[in-house]
Amino acid sequence: MKKLALMMVAAMITSLTFAQKLQEKDVPASVKTAFQKNFPQAKVEKWEKEGVNFEAEFELNKSEQSVLFDAQGGIIETEIEIEISELPNGIVDYVKTNYKGQSVKEAAKITDTKGTLTYEAEIKGMDLLFDSNGKFIKEIKN
């Protein structure tokens, strides 16, 4: 019985970590207002719910971007797609060495509210996170 309960809790936590697509009408007004205030020249292409947070995907200055908001409209982080060649030295080599047969498909620069910069390298089935110096942090399965 304990095992079943633990499996159910794990399944619930896992389901909360995956993004769920949302209709704009399902996004809190505070979040939509915050988006319009911070990115007045952009139009949301897609809304997603990530756990208790809300992600807006949009294009700005010819680059794919996203911003993650809390339910009150506070920015948690921003993500800007970059060229793979813009990743810090060593990230592409790290992928080749540690994920045999894989290559980086997409790359992004992520900045949190404290100004901390991380890089995301997307490979098949997961995203790999690196610090601003290119040091591996963790992998996130898609």
Where are these regions (language model features)?
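Bacterial Sec-dependent N-terminal signal peptides
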Residues: 1-22
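Short, non-transmembrane alpha-helical segments in secretory-pathway proteins
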Residues: 22-44, 85-103
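Acidic (E/D-rich), amphipathic helical modules within compact regulatory domains
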Residues: 36-79
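A short beta-turn/loop motif at secondary-structure boundaries
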Residues: 48-50, 110-114
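Conserved histidines in hydrophobic membrane contexts and catalytic metal-binding motifs
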Residues: 56-57, 115-126
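Mid-chain, structured segments of secreted extracytoplasmic proteins
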Residues: 61, 65-105
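Short, low-complexity, Pro/Ser/Thr/Gly-rich segments in the mature regions of secreted, periplasmic
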Residues: 127, 131-142
